């Protein structure tokens, strides 16, 4: 288990439940990729639960998309090229995520309509988020970190030998 996965677990599984999926993913990726203000999760606050509990795209993916954009903007001087490369990384991430979990939509992944009355509370009480959502965060952090390293935008930390999720066959 990598340091990044341990950090994600520390944040996501904390009893205070202070950070959601998108926030944890953004924080951990910002730390892993050496981005400034790594502890700032505020851009991802409303992205948890598939964007404001709407059940849309998984917060782990949207948090990773924010990190990918920040990273591309830091590494590539040309704004158009940075956007293209950030999109490419996120598209690869989403393809692998879909192959691994069957969907990228929170509603399908969780089986809950988190925006409906009582559903978020039921989702939290059921506790499967501690396993299922955690696995999705772990996959996303590992995969985007790997893709960033492949692109030459990040180096593996000393002593960190990550288990890289497989790339799905195309």
Task: Pin down the residues of each PLM region.
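Phosphate-handling active-site elements
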Residues: 32-42, 68-89
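Mg2+-dependent prenyl diphosphate-binding active-site environment of isoprenoid biosynthetic enzymes
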Residues: 23, 61-71, 87, 95, ...
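Polybasic, low-complexity association/targeting segments
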Residues: 1-16
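Glycine/serine-rich anion-binding loops at beta->alpha junctions
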Residues: 19, 47-66
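Acidic-glycine-rich active-site phosphate/pyrophosphate-binding loop
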Residues: 1, 28-46, 115-117
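C-terminal binding/interaction regions
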Residues: 87-170
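An acidic intrinsically disordered interaction segment
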Residues: 19-36, 108-111
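Short glycine/serine- and small hydrophobic-enriched flexible loop segments
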Residues: 27-31, 66-73, 142-146
């Amino acid at each position: 288990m990598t340091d990044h996965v341990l950090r994600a677990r520390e944040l996501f599984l904390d009893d205070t439940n202070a950070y959601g999926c998108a926030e944890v993913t953004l924080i951990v990726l910002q730390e892993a990729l050496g981005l400034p203000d790594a502890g700032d999760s505020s851009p991802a606050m409303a992205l948890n639960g598939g964007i404001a509990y709407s059940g849309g795209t998984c917060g782990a993916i949207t948090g990773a998309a924010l990190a990918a954009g920040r990273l591309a903007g830091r590494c590539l001087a040309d704004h158009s090229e940075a956007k293209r490369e950030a999109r490419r990384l996120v598209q690869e991430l989403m393809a692998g995520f879909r192959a691994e979990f069957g969907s990228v939509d929170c509603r399908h992944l969780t089986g809950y309509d988190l925006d409906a009355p009582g559903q978020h509370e039921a989702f939290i009480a059921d506790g499967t988020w501690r396993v299922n959502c955690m696995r999705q965060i772990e996959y996303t952090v590992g995969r985007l970190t790997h893709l960033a390293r492949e692109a030459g935008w990040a180096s593996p930390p000393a002593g960190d030998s990550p288990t890289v999720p497989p790339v799905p066959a195309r």
